[in-house]
Amino acid sequence: GRNSVQFGNLLADEEFGGTEYGGVFFNAAFGQPAFWSANTLNTGPAFNVPALGFRYRRNFTDTWYAQAAVYDGDTFDSAGGDATINQHGTHFELGNGQGWTSLYEFGRNGFNNDDGAGLPGWYRVGAWHHSTSFAKHDGTNGEGNWGLYGIADKMLWREEGGQGLGTFIRLGTAQRDRSRFHWVLDTGLSYTGLLPGRDDDVAGLGFVYAKHAGDITDAVKSHEAVIEATYRIQLT
């Protein structure tokens, strides 16, 4: 259908901010993006801690879509980060200054109508917001934190049977005066069927660069970076 609604204990990273070709990598920075997870309260509703939420999606065509969602602001139900309080995902608590998390995304997913011959792509822009109070780097508090992001996945080379080379790039930001990372970039390449006779194996090379907010670089290094090379073997 054109309209889709979800309500319940949800994982935001399953539907917002993900990448088609970044899923092969093990480092968590290639999953839920660090420009959101590191700059919100207790990482937000993402694997493996869901949150009570509501998501609406409108499919304008087979490829164009828009979606928005709102979630409980603290998946741990603990401002101090005690993960044991909601370790089973059944502790529901709203209020107490937790605020709420919201995400918004608009995009075109060419993989939805891939004809098996062309080079499809998936392009989207989005925003995230958390409403609670955050400590700023100057010692004061600020209401809320938010950021913007853009993501592109593109198949670059196709072989028969779904094999081929694809790439992704993802860039996101957050408010500089109250965030750990001011902006984060991750990108990579993924090749399915690189080796002869191994049509379902996937090889990948990925890179993440996370720029610390300028106000905290006196205490820590200016950035963090990840380089990962991986090879996933299909056994059966």
Range-by-range predicted roles:
Residues 1, 7, 54-58, 104-108, ...:
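Residues on the lipid-exposed face of transmembrane beta-strands in outer-membrane beta-barrel proteins
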Residues 2, 17, 63, 111-122, ...:
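Short loop/turn motifs that connect adjacent beta-strands in outer-membrane beta-barrel proteins
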Residues 2-102:
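Surface-exposed coil loops of outer-membrane beta-barrel proteins
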Residues 5-9, 66-72, 123-129, 165-173, ...:
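Transmembrane beta-barrel strands of outer-membrane/channel proteins
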Residues 39-42, 85-94, 137-139, 172-176, ...:
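Extracellular loop and loop/strand-boundary signature of outer-membrane beta-barrel proteins
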Residues 48-52, 98-102, 144-148, 181-185, ...:
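Residues that define the transmembrane beta-barrel architecture of outer-membrane proteins
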Residues 73-153, 159:
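Surface-exposed beta-loop-beta
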Residues 179-236:
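C-terminal hydrophobic structural anchor segments
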